[in-house]
A protein has these predicted regions:
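Extracellular glycan-recognition surfaces and repeat-rich motifs
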Residues: 338-362
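Beta-propeller blade signature
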Residues: 63-64, 117-123, 170-175, 227-234, ...
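Secretory/extracellular carbohydrate-interaction modules
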Residues: 366-421
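Hydrophobic core segments of beta-strands in well-ordered, beta-rich domains
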Residues: 29, 35-55, 74, 89-109, ...
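Blade-edge beta-strand/turn elements of extracellular beta-propeller
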Residues: 21-30, 69-81, 122-137, 173-195, ...
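Loop/turn-rich, solvent-exposed surfaces of beta-rich toroidal or solenoidal domains
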Residues: 194-240, 255
Length: 443
């Protein structure tokens, strides 16, 4: 068996094992960097997609029947839509007239401005047909969310994030097919506090329209992301911000948390899926999906069942289910195609793969100025890990394993011809080598 364990440094994940009891589970529910997650239920099956940033394929897709145990099945796009360039962020599911829509953020080839595109398929795991940009607004339009009200579709998004003015959550009616704007945009909510505002979930319940949105800093070691809420009796507002905001924020075991969407169980319970950073070494696992139950209080505001401080330990959504432990990843390359867990950093190298007779052939053409080769990557399941691979060393090309952040931040170990090579490139100083590195060569 030939195994390849390759990882990317910025998107690791934590192995949590079994939940403490059968009636509880431990967040994250997906191990690895899947930021800005969107969740939808179709019949008895739940589907997640999320940000893929500069990694291909684009927007990973996961499925589950119990909200806790997830399996990656593929991606929304195997190839980039023609109009897009980079920054594949915040996809949002929506089901309409028997079709599944995904509204996603990407930068345009023409001017590098982030806008919102739309694609349609028969199911979340089907082949999506892209219909191009649906929202182009100023310097940036990101973080789409769809609401149907009185038979009409409305799209909301974050605007003015790159302007010298308060961020606003804007909205506009869509055409009946959900593919184009129909009318003029209007403002839902404004960030007068200048603390940040994005990642909204917009819904109607018990006579109110609610916007659950994220505030403060989304990303990085100083992230203090949190979740707030506003409500209105009218779709177009004005929206009243909850005096007790934020309703969900970090804790001793969660650095920061936010940007999510709500799904409902068949019996009507509401679960909010968002992303969170973990403190300490877990931070480098990236923004991982967290699941928390939310209920409407007697005050007609939504509240999280386990309180405003984010908690990794949560009650199981379904008593008959139990959280399955995370197993080590291995691949013997006996399938006809690559497993969906694999990805590559597309801005730096065009990756080509061939699987034949239990072997993977990996090659690629680096972009101008890039000094590294092709890297096929996956998210590990712990901040501490062992990597092992068997390679066929038949030429002078470099081959081996890598800890990979991007082409400017990596550690590699492998061989070329009769040479055993260990090298690293560190631009961001995020990798610290505190102990001597040991190499073992098995002939």
């Amino acid at each position: 068996m030939r195994k390849i364990f390759t990882l990317f440094f910025c998107a690791a994940s934590l192995a949590t094992g079994l939940a403490q009891q059968e009636s509880y589970f431990t967040n994250p529910v997906i191990h690895g960097d899947v930021a800005d997650p969107s969740i939808i239920r179709i019949d008895q099956t739940y589907y997640i997609t999320g940000t893929s940033s500069e990694w291909a394929p684009y927007y990973p897709v996961f499925t589950s029947t119990d909200l806790v145990n997830w399996q990656q099945t593929g991606h929304v796009f195997d190839e980039k839509p023609e109009w897009t360039k980079s920054s594949f962020w915040a996809p949002e599911w929506y089901q309409h007239k028997g079709k599944v829509y995904v509204y996603y953020t990407a930068r345009k080839q023409s001017d590098n401005i982030s806008c919102i595109g739309v694609a349609v398929a028969d199911s979340p795991t089907g082949k999506f047909k892209d219909y191009g940009p649906v929202v182009e607004f100023g310097k940036e339009a990101i973080d789409a969310f769809i609401l149907e009200d009185k038979g009409k579709l409305y799209i909301s998004w974050k605007a003015y994030g790159l302007d010298n003015q308060p961020i606003e959550l804007l909205a506009c009616k869509l055409t009946d097919d959900g593919l184009r704007l129909d009318g003029k945009p209007f403002s839902l909510l404004r960030d007068d506090e200048r603390q940040g505002m994005e990642g909204q979930h917009w819904f109607k319940k018990d006579g109110y329209y609610y916007i659950i949105y994220s505030v403060r800093g989304c990303c990085g070691p100083q992230s203090d992301y949190a979740v707030s809420v506003a409500r209105s009796k009218k779709l177009e507002g004005p929206y009243e911000k909850y005096q007790g905001n934020p309703i969900l924020h970090g804790s001793k075991e969660v650095l920061s948390i936010g940007h999510g969407t709500i799904t409902t169980t068949p019996d009507g319970r509401m679960y909010y899926l968002c992303h969170a950073y973990q403190p300490g070494s877990g931070f480098y696992q990236g923004r991982q999906p967290y699941l928390q139950e939310v209920r409407m209080g007697e005050d007609h505001w939504p509240h999280f069942v386990t309180g405003e401080y984010a908690s990794r330990t949560q009650p199981m959504p379904f008593a008959e289910s139990a959280q399955v432990p995370v197993f080590d990843f291995s691949d013997d390359f006996t399938g006809a195609t690559l497993r969906p867990e694999w990805s590559w950093n597309y801005p730096y190298t065009d990756v080509k793969t061939e699987i034949k007779n239990g072997k993977l052939s990996l090659s690629g053409t680096p972009k101008p100025g890039v000094k590294t080769g092709a890297a096929l990557c996956l998210r590990p399941t712990s901040p501490d890990y062992t990597l092992e691979t068997a390679i066929v060393n038949r030429n002078d090309s470099w081959k081996g394993i890598t800890m990979y952040g991007d082409a400017n931040n990596l550690i590699t170990c492998g061989c070329a011809g009769d040479r055993l090579i260990l090298k690293y490139i560190l631009e961001l100083s995020l990798i610290h080598i505190s102990e001597p590195t040991r190499l073992r060569c098995i002939s």
